[in-house]
């Protein structure tokens, strides 16, 4: 997207006593390797940094992103730190393009080893629009958006987004504000309305809400603190909905505080080859208002190890628990769901666990684990190109979803979670869609099927971002 250009501090003369005449130039041996070494190790000073193309972007925002350039001591460091500064500027989301030019200093105050660095930038327009498609957990959607980037000159942005999907329709307005000099620290506010259809539960849900969140890093972890207030309207999706679903119909008001911690050392979010992910989330509802009260904990763990022949062994573990607070039972909208091509394969979407007349009610506790082996395609067709997006996939999944009696002790809870384990195994193909999503086509053999579970024995297709 951009290039770092640099001029030599000491250009090689083309004639003169140091080089010879043009006639005998072919008798002189030039050693570019030594010249390059001298150039790399020569001490330099960055005297000035110029910006061309700035409009509404504030100077203090820019100054924090390019400060390290002045600390460079040689040409290689100048080029490296200039490239890092360019990446930081692009990450702000206020420039369409950033180019870097490194040149020798000129002017009366120029020193012999002085350098000037120039960033040529192109700012985004005040209003931009977008149209794209997105892939969620076994759901596709069309997304229309309007964005006001760099609203006040310090990388703020306001976004309006409308999404129409196969199971969900939503629109929302959000405002994003990063901390100057520390983009990972940011604040955002969201207003939204989401209408979703959940055929596995014969349920329709409409959420109208507002949320505010703060994101910040601590050492190698990233944290999110969030408050959310949402008015939820639940209704029956079909006239044949069970009585248990009809009992859940109506309006509830949830006000909750949540905290999420993430440690991610993976080399990629989609089909990583190495690294680990740990994500822990806690949510407490009811103490800041509303008529829904609960404590909810869940986690996600993933480990990836690269093996011989470009194969990858991946293991993952999910788990969670929902504890109602007070006399009111938990809502179907807050419980966990399990099953489908993105979790325990070989079972239909969210069709494991408690159910009533064919409508799945979710559970207050669950766990799920998986072991996966990803290998290149046999005989490596399309190696180095399109073929590298495909992987063969061998998997073993297991999990359970249930309700707990919180009057019992932890031993009884663990025993309940260890009963009636559903598991499956199989093989298939995986297609990586950039670093955005992945598609799976697997042949699944479900095992440990319990009464009421809905299975998908044979070929199963899955699309999404988060997979077990």
Curated annotation (Swiss-Prot):
Record note on quaternary structure: Associates with the mitochondrial contact site and cristae organizing system (MICOS) complex (also known as MINOS or MitOS complex).
Pfam families: Omp85 (PF01103)
UniProt keyword annotations, A-Z: Membrane, Mitochondrion, Mitochondrion outer membrane, Transmembrane, Transmembrane beta strand
Protein name: Sorting and assembly machinery component 50 homolog B
Annotated POTRA domain residues: 44-124
InterPro entries registered for this protein in UniProt: Bac_surfAg_D15, D15-like, POTRA
Stretch list, region Disordered: 1-25
Family designation: Belongs to the SAM50/omp85 family.
UniProt superkingdom: Eukaryota
Gene3D superfamilies assigned: membrane protein fhac, membrane protein fhac: a member of the omp85/tpsb transporter family
A GO-annotated cellular component: mitochondrial outer membrane
Domain notes: Its C-terminal part seems to contain many membrane-spanning sided beta-sheets, that have the potential to adopt a transmembrane beta-barrel type structure.
Gene Ontology BP term (one): cristae formation
PROSITE patterns: POTRA
Subcellular location: Mitochondrion outer membrane
Taxonomic source organism: Xenopus laevis
Function, in words: May play a role in the maintenance of the structure of mitochondrial cristae.
Membrane-protein topology: Multi-pass membrane protein
